[in-house]
Amino acid sequence: MTYWTLGVLAVGLGADAFSMALGIGMEGVRRRDAFMLGLVVALFHIFMPWFGILAGSALGLVVGRLASFIGAAVLFFLGGRMIYHAWKEKREGPAFPVSVPRRRGNGSGGGAIVGAGAIVGGRLFAPTRWELVVIGAAVSMDALSVGFSLGTVGAQLLPTVLTFGVVAGIMTVAGCRIGQQVSRMLGATAQLAGGLILLGIGIKLLLGSASPG
């Protein structure tokens, strides 16, 4: 496998993480949480294909499809929650005034990347450690399946998984930052758009798991 092919594959695997981070950035996320999310996604994009490459492609079809259903369920939950929040705020009004002050942090790396959730609803995406793990796993399921496939073609283990991890981590943080900028322009509608993005990724996972071969 050439480095060019490896890079393209890494970007493709990171696309789901980027899209999900875009939706999260629209809702609003602290810089610290954005970087933590990027780190967790990077680690999953290292260890899941690592396991897949070592295990080979013998169980790739079965495990890959089961993983896709799990990932789709998680993304449906996250997307549905964001859409519900957007609908509730449009119906009842924002929980705080639109001019709510932006959080600047306290010098400990906790400054906020403010998105629609913070500007309109007064909320920030503030995941627990467990939620970070679940989210990171949900967008890394394809990496497991790809690992099984790469195990049959003798792909170099360390360069492959490190490339996957670094690219996915960067794309995740970038998605949060871009989502921030989009939310400033779209306001409350950004939460709805972010939820639809997550639902779209979930549908993609389901369609992929249902396709033959």
Swiss-Prot record:
Record membrane topology: Multi-pass membrane protein
Superkingdom, taxonomy of origin: Bacteria
Keyword S-adenosyl-L-methionine on entry: no
Main location: membrane
GO cellular component, one term: plasma membrane
Stored Pfam families: Mntp (PF02659)
Stated family: Belongs to the MntP (TC 9.B.29) family.
Name assigned to this protein: Putative manganese efflux pump MntP
Origin species: Heliobacterium modesticaldum (strain ATCC 51547 / Ice1)
Gene this protein is translated from: mntP
